[in-house]
Amino acid sequence: MPKQHVYHLHPLGWENDPEEERFKVTTLDYLTVCSYNNYALFFKLEDSEKERAAEILKAGLERTLAQARHYCGTIEKDPGGGHSFTKKRNSTVRFFVQWLDAPEDADKYPSFEDLEKTNFSAVTLGDLEQWSVPPMTYGEKPEAHPDNSPVVSAFKANFIRGGLVFNIHHHHYTNDVMGWAGFVHQLAENCYAAVNGTKHPTWDPLNLDVSRLIKQEPPEDQKIDGPAPPERHPAHQVGMSLLFHLPKSKAAELKAKATPTDGTWISTYDAFSAFIWRNLTRIRAPVFNPDPKSTLYWCEAIDMRRRMHSPKVPPRIQHNVMFAVTSPTAPVTQPTVAQIMSEWSLSELASYIRRLTNSVTQENLDKTLEMVATIRDKTSLNTRVDAQPPLSILQTDHRDANITSADFGFAKPATYRHLLDRITEGVIIVYPPRDPLPESDEGCEFAIFYEKRLAQDLINDDEWSEYFEYRGVDAEDASEAKKANGTNGTNGVNGSS
């Protein structure tokens, strides 16, 4: 068995904390995915740096947990309805330190070089339970339901030959990706200060002020029943996550191709989103045979931090400060399958994405939350794209996370991944470039959760591969991964190229 130690970390200064603190789960938190997230940061490290890195992370976490205070404790029911992140004076957060770098275990656990060669694939890691804090891996599961007192967070430092895989677990109610990125940058700055003996970063108390996202609820007898909790659509097939790379030069070509001739502005995001939607629909249409006159479900997570204006919010505000705009409910006319595939020009489809994104405002969000406040059981309102039929897409944009610039004092991450052993069909994660230097052509990476038996059709498609480079299998469903023997390029899908 690998050597492992667990620390039960108190937030710095815990001795003087109140006996109990409760941080309300916001009305908006209920609309996110009811699951755990586990993001892994990958560091390149010499053996001589590892012990010190573990101590630095421990000290940095103690200070950061005293700032992002809702990370310490459990989610509990409130007596008057709803839920709260509940921190008691003696609450702790588990920090595991595991050593997977013994020479005799070289055939059991990958090195940093092995991970780098496979673009930091979860398949290369093998059984994610070895690298994680069960049951806090991604996926809708009873342990994550807020009525079951879920633990809010845990951390695990896995030292490997040549590096470190630092796994950060948190309940999705705790943070969206940009809230998590704010937490990571705060942690990195705290670690950097500990290493260099410099002043620690400040923490804006408004980072925990999410009162504007908590709407007044009517009396219990005036509330209404919401929909049944969403379940996975029966038509879905076994999925896997495929990793693709869009070089910056190719993204620029796509934007030029998708820009309307009338001078209407679109973004690079609009261009690649339109291209993705068109081609993923075109390639799979012969299999799923959608009615050309029907419409498809497109959902994108919009970061509201930049869209809040009355008043503005600090960039590191915690919780879920995002809104999932969906094509069926947005005040924009949806395209049909035929229009998505070919009848609309790429410019028209990109312009639709821009109108969809622009339809999300602080005012629209407020109206939605006022409606949500009237629902009796808000836990049934969580977003679940695999409850929609095949060909549905939920795209989440991580481009502003900028994790590779976070200097922990002992190293900067080479990249990060949302580690997965459960595939939610229809999800697309847009990762920021690993190399942010202007002269580099390294662009965004895309983890596309796709039907396994159709994967090779996408990888080999000429129109798709003209822009998107295949980088290998990013993740497989746990039941399938056991058949893969922990190696990439198995199960009939080619490895990275």
UniProtKB/Swiss-Prot annotation:
Function: Acetyltransferase; part of the gene cluster that mediates the biosynthesis of the tetraketides fugralins such as linear fugralin A and cyclic fugralin B, volatile compounds that play a role in the asexual reproductive cycle but are not involved in pathogenicity. One of the key features of fugralins is the presence of a double methyl group, which is only rarely encountered in fungal secondary metabolites. As the fugralins cluster does not contain an independent methyltransferase, the PKS FGR1 is probably responsible for adding two methyl groups to the same carbon atom.
Region ranges (Disordered): 477-497
Superkingdom of origin: Eukaryota
Lineage: Eukaryota, Fungi, Dikarya, Ascomycota, Pezizomycotina
Keyword Metal-binding (UniProt): yes
Protein residues bound to CoA: 255, 303, 396
Binding-site residues, Ca(2+): 221, 224, 386, 462
Biased segments, Low complexity type: 485-497
Broad EC category: transferase
Keyword match Nucleus: no
Pfam families xrefs: Transferase
Documented EC number(s): 2.3.1.-
Keyword terms: Calcium, Metal-binding, Transferase
InterPro entries named among the record's database cross-references: CAT-like_dom_sf, Sec_Metabolite_Acyltrans
Gene name linked to the record: FGR3
Molecular function, one GO term: metal ion binding
Known pathway: Secondary metabolite biosynthesis
Stated family: Belongs to the trichothecene 3-O-acetyltransferase family.
Name this protein carries in UniProt: Acetyltransferase FGR3
